[in-house]
Amino acid sequence: MASTAARRLAWVAVRPGALWSGPRGRRGGDVYTVPGSSGLSQVPSRSVIVTRSGAILPKPVKMSFGLLRVFSIVIPFLYVGTLISKNFAALLEEHDIFVPEDDDDDD
C-alpha cells in the first residue's frame, strides 16, 4: 500500500502540470483547447489583459497618427493608382478593346 502511494506521488511529481487545476489541454494563443464531449471546445483566456496572478496589465502605449503621417501614405498611393489606371485605359483604347463613343451624347 505504501509503495503504491509512493509511486503515485513520484508520477505526480514527474508529470508536468499535474497539480494545476485549470483547463487541461494545449494552449494556443488566447484560447485553451479542452477535450469535450463533441471534440474540442475552446475556453477563452485573458492573458493579454491580465497577468497569471490576476493583476491587470497597464495600458499599451498609444501611437498617434498625425495628418502628416496619413497624407504621406495616402497621397503617393492615390497618385500611383491614377497612373496605373490611366496607362491601362490607354492600353485598352490602343488595342481597340474598349473605345469610348462620343456619339451617344445626343439623346
Swiss-Prot record:
Residue range covered by the transit peptide: 1-47
GO biological process terms held by the UniProt record: calcium import into the mitochondrion; cellular response to calcium ion starvation; mitochondrial calcium ion homeostasis; mitochondrial calcium ion transmembrane transport
Keywords tagged on the record: Calcium, Calcium transport, Ion transport, Membrane, Mitochondrion, Mitochondrion inner membrane, Transit peptide, Transmembrane, Transmembrane helix, Transport
Any one GO molecular-function label of the UniProt entry: protein-macromolecule adaptor activity
Tissue-specific expression: Widely expressed.
Membrane topology (UniProt): Single-pass membrane protein
Signal found in the keyword field: no
Mitochondrial intermembrane compartment residues: 86-107
Transmembrane spans: 66-85
Subcellular localization: Mitochondrion inner membrane
Sequence motif: GXXXX[G/A/S], positions: 81-85
Side Mitochondrial matrix, residues: 48-65
Post-translational modification (record): Undergoes proteolytic degradation in neurons: degraded by AFG3L2 and SPG7 before SMDT1/EMRE assembly with the uniporter complex, limiting the availability of SMDT1/EMRE for MCU assembly and promoting efficient assembly of gatekeeper subunits with MCU.
Summary of subunit composition and partner proteins: Component of the uniplex complex, composed of MCU, EMRE/SMDT1, MICU1 and MICU2 (or MICU3) in a 4:4:1:1 stoichiometry. The number of EMRE/SMDT1 molecules is hovewer variable, ranging from 1 to 4 copies per uniplex complex, leading to uniplex complexes with distinct gatekeeping profiles. Interacts (via its C-terminal poly-Asp tail) with MCUR1; the interaction is direct. Unprocessed form interacts (via transit peptide) with MAIP1.
Domains (record comment): The GXXXX[G/A/S] motif at the C-terminal part of the transmembrane region mediates interaction with MCU and is required to activate the calcium-conducting pore in the uniporter complex. The poly-Asp region at the C-terminus mediates interaction with the polybasic region of MICU1.
Membership in a protein family: Belongs to the SMDT1/EMRE family.
UniProt name for this protein: Essential MCU regulator, mitochondrial
Organism expressing this protein natively: Mus musculus (Mouse)
Encoding gene (name): Smdt1
